[in-house]
From Swiss-Prot:
It comes from Caenorhabditis briggsae. Interacts with let-60. This is Leucine-rich repeat protein soc-2. It holds the Pfam family LRR_8. The keyword Repeat applies. Gene3D superfamilies: Ribonuclease Inhibitor. The lineage of its organism: Eukaryota, Metazoa, Ecdysozoa, Nematoda, Chromadorea. Belongs to the SHOC2 family. GO terms for molecular function: volume-sensitive anion channel activity. PANTHER family: P53-INDUCED DEATH DOMAIN PROTEIN 1, PTHR48051. Residues 1-17 have a biased composition (Basic and acidic residues). The keyword Repeat applies. It comes from the Eukaryota.
Amino acid sequence: METSKEFEFRPAKETSRSKSPGGIVGRLSNFARNKARHSLSEKGSNSVGGSGGSGFDKPRKDLLKEFHKCKEAQDQRLDLSSIEITSIPSPIKELTQLTELFLYKNKLTCLPTEIGQLVNLKKLGLSENALSSLPDSLSSLESLETLDLRHNKLTEVPAVIYKITSLETLWLRYNRIVAVDEQIGNLQKLKMLDVRENKIRELPSAIGKLSSLVVCLVSYNHLTRVPEEIGECHALTQLDLQHNDLSELPYSIGKLTNLVRIGIRYNKIRCIPSELESCQQLEEFIVESNHLQLLPPNLLTMLPKIHTVNLSRNELTAFPAGGPQQFVPTVTINMEHNQISKIPIGIFSKATRLTKLNLKENELVSLPLDMGSWTSITELNLSTNQLKVLPEDIEKLVNLEILVLSNNQLKKLPNQIGNLKKLRELDLEENELETVPTEIGFLQHLTKLWVQSNKIVTLPRSIGNLCSLQDLRLGENNLTAIPEEIGHLDSLKSLYLNDNSSLHNLPFELALCQSLEIMSIENSPLSQIPPEITAGGPSLVIQYLKMQGPYRGVVMTGQ
């Protein structure tokens, strides 16, 4: 079960075309997706790449034509994106009616000073160019609200930006910026600041003056500290600090009482300030990949809206102090890759909304006696622990759909496993199983059964009842035979039988698996089948079984 993506802090999605971010960011401004009716990229007759004329004269002529059309129609939006222009001619100054100008994905290295005469401009999109500076004339754009400079070559925030005090949304992601000046405090109307994926080492204290700031995205930089003044940004709902070099958070973080999401994954944080308990609007607590050994007592209990808890890849040796109450609102818990050796009895007794629990890669040796009370869970990952026994109460997890128990020390499965009627995926790789219970045949919705790298000698005939099974992995066991009932698996697409040193025969009924696309038989002797057939691969083996057995009239649609 893959969990890392599920628990990832995702304030915004990006594509190669630099679409505007989604979520709160998207609601602030979604202009990057809009296309104007005068976009040159949609007009073949005005294509800059057309033949005839010099490389400079042709685009200049086309742009002038577009400027004329725009002025004649008094259009307020002009899109000149993705046409490989390297410069903007000065007559653009005549388009004073423009409120939106898009110049995405071109080859601009500079802008003309005349752009400062577009005094009605509210949105200016310059993403995916080669800009290293901006003209001072942009300070005249007193109506400009949104400025997108993602994917350029800026090494600093151009000084003129600090003079555009009307700005509400500022995108500077994917540049080479090393610092943000104290003058950022001039942007009193700024609601969204995106400086992700730069080389910034610290934020200025003046950031505390941004009283309107709602979203602050600073991930993938080199921050070593966050100024205490961040606590003055009372409007903040999203603060993304993930993938930096932070060793601590400021105590003032507790003043951000409107905070809904805080991303601090992949830092070097050793402790969380208890003041965070004042952020009672928080819905996600994601601190993956830090150096936490514990949390402040009752921290999660004081955060009543938390639905996602991700404490994975830290140095925890026990569950957070706070008892069952701390998980009342929680839907997803990920504590993968820690040093936890025990699940306290009753810890999930009030977690009636809990659907996903990941305790992979810990030091668990047993499961609590009240495991049967985890009835809301649909996905449970306990792989890479030291479990030797599954409690019979596992049958009470009636909503379980995915169960991952790989890389433990299990010697047998309880027969009650057959009562998990909703189970779709069962992963038992790398254990010490010698048998599979007959009751496995009751799992009518099972699509994936992985039991490779065990000590299994035989399979129950009931395996033929798994009508939904698509992926069956039996490699690296001690199998001596495969039951003929395997021929009933009409949905089976992949079958792994590799590295079974005592497996000499395959049932002719295998030829009835008409959906079979992949079969691995490497390092299994299969003396029943001629070497030249096995050398030809799975497809030839299936055809051989079909021709040699009693099913030679069956048409193999999967081959």
